[in-house]
Amino acid sequence: MRGLLRKWLILGVAFLVLLPPPVPAHPDTGESKSLSIVHLGDSYSSGNGLSNHHGPPSCLRSSNTWGSLFASWANSQGVATSYQNRACSGGNIDDLFSPRALPQQSAKEVAANSIEEARARLEETDACSARAAGDDLLSVNHHLRESDGLLLWTRKYTYECQLTVRAQTDFVGPQTDLVLLTAGGNELGFTDIIANCFGPRIPGALGGANGTKCREGVAATTSGLPEMLDRLKSQISRLITERMTGNPKSQVILLAYPLLSLDRPYHLPDGAVSYDAARGVRELGRAAIREQRRIIDELENDFPGR
């Protein structure tokens, strides 16, 4: 990890055009160079919002992620590169080695004479988009129940689709040369921090930015960084020792999150004083990067060259 991983632990994705590819599976031999990449993590890896989504609907995987761009670049450099995106929006550290029940989809209705017929109809029409989940899919729960109203000749049933997907590391194996990863943001409540520090006020939906909640959230998240990163370190250790066993030069690249505020003051009322939310959130981001560097150093000591 040392050197390569340290260079690649940066903010953003500009590194795609600046850095050399990692060591391929067959370096400095007469064999063709190849690279097997698996991308794991949360929305920063799945590509939430980048369009061209595929896979389990709630995962919001895009074909335009930074990992996909890197794989395309590596192919252009003559390295035969395969790429799998198994990251999932909303994912957390535990999802790396554990199945995950995705959020329930919005409630809909289906007409049928019985609950068995309703379930069969949903499966036949792929009402839950289970086919899109492909080999990620473990199970589908329709959460079927009979609706109150009756149609003239049949019953109505309400269903709320919920898919359960496999652990992300199920797709990492001895053949994997490189794992790309972002993880930890959802555990630390980054969504709440953004809402409390910069969110608009929407009556009945969002309370808007609040200086006290922002300050307290930043402080609580900062104090939780060491424990959370230690958990992530443990998962990366498992990844290397239990999954990435085929290539002694295989690597894990942990990418830092971008700083979530601009480098200019953004003051919020905080009791009798004010709180600079922008500064607090940027300091939190820098603290997270320092903790990531700490566990990287420790992992490099445990797994030299990985």
Predicted regions and their residues:
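Short, well-ordered alpha-helix to beta-strand connector turns
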Residues: 14-15, 34, 80, 175-176
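Serine-esterase "nucleophile elbow" of acetyl-processing enzymes
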Residues: 30-107, 111-114, 198-205
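Alpha-helical cap/lid subdomain in secreted, periplasmic
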Residues: 146-306
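Short, well-structured alpha-helical segments in soluble
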Residues: 99-175
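Secretory targeting and sorting signals
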Residues: 1-27
